């Protein structure tokens, strides 16, 4: 007798975090999840993009999804407490919290939340992200938000840290013009393609960061159907803005700074008006190895 094993739905089993339909973000808000190789500049990109959206008159919420809780400090000019830390203080009785306990106003009115995460080696970061969205909904803090940006830990695409993809309309992948960054990007494309079968998330495009050239990124895009939405060269003012704990929009308006500001504003406008969902087709590892590099 032959038995058939049915594949579980997305979110069933030990490798996924099941989406609670009651904690979906309201229709109408543009929800963007930012992924990329660890250390590639996702938090810098997310914060400056949030600032750009706010400059366009949008009400913006940025949610940091990294236990390091360093996503939003250039917006708030300080390290803010995490949702998980605040919940622990009240023994996870969220009804005892006020919005000011866990949500903080940053540059130009951008609202900032750091979800935090469980101690190393314990728990699931995706669960924490879900609880953060649930808490925001309980306090009706998403109802008037135009743009939500999830800044996600490293290039981890397990069921837990893929959780923001369950809320997002689009995913932006931050990459440099090098093998390791593009290799990580390919893994992320695979995760998004898997999630797109059951959720609304689609690829929004690529952000080339800290790269003078984009020839290797261009090769990858051509093979996989991706598109570069913005290109930020290795401008020292961006590095210095992190050290000054501020966004690029608060730096002295030199020629380089204005160029970067305009690129972020252009990216924000395109995400609002001109973004086309991309059908990314990830490569096999050997294919990337053979594709990238020089003849």
Curated annotation (Swiss-Prot):
ATP binds at residues 39-44, 68, 209-210. The lineage of its organism: Bacteria, Bacillati, Cyanobacteriota, Cyanophyceae, Synechococcales. Its cofactor is [4Fe-4S] cluster. It catalyses: chlorophyllide a + oxidized 2[4Fe-4S]-[ferredoxin] + 2 ADP + 2 phosphate = protochlorophyllide a + reduced 2[4Fe-4S]-[ferredoxin] + 2 ATP + 2 H2O. Homodimer. Protochlorophyllide reductase is composed of three subunits; ChlL, ChlN and ChlB. PROSITE patterns: NIFH_FRXC_1, NIFH_FRXC_2, NIFH_FRXC_3. Mg(2+) binds at residue 43. Pathway: Porphyrin-containing compound metabolism; chlorophyll biosynthesis (light-independent). This is Light-independent protochlorophyllide reductase iron-sulfur ATP-binding protein. Binds 1 [4Fe-4S] cluster per dimer. Keywords: 4Fe-4S, ATP-binding, Chlorophyll biosynthesis, Iron, Iron-sulfur, Magnesium, Metal-binding, Nucleotide-binding, Oxidoreductase, Photosynthesis. [4Fe-4S] cluster binds at residues 124, 158. One of its GO terms (molecular function) is oxidoreductase activity, acting on the CH-CH group of donors, iron-sulfur protein as acceptor. Component of the dark-operative protochlorophyllide reductase (DPOR) that uses Mg-ATP and reduced ferredoxin to reduce ring D of protochlorophyllide (Pchlide) to form chlorophyllide a (Chlide). This reaction is light-independent. The L component serves as a unique electron donor to the NB-component of the complex, and binds Mg-ATP. The gene is chlL. Its EC number is 1.3.7.7. Belongs to the NifH/BchL/ChlL family. It comes from Prochlorococcus marinus (strain AS9601). The keyword Chloroplast does not apply. It holds the Pfam family Fer4_NifH. Signal peptide: none annotated. One of its GO terms (biological process) is photosynthesis, dark reaction.
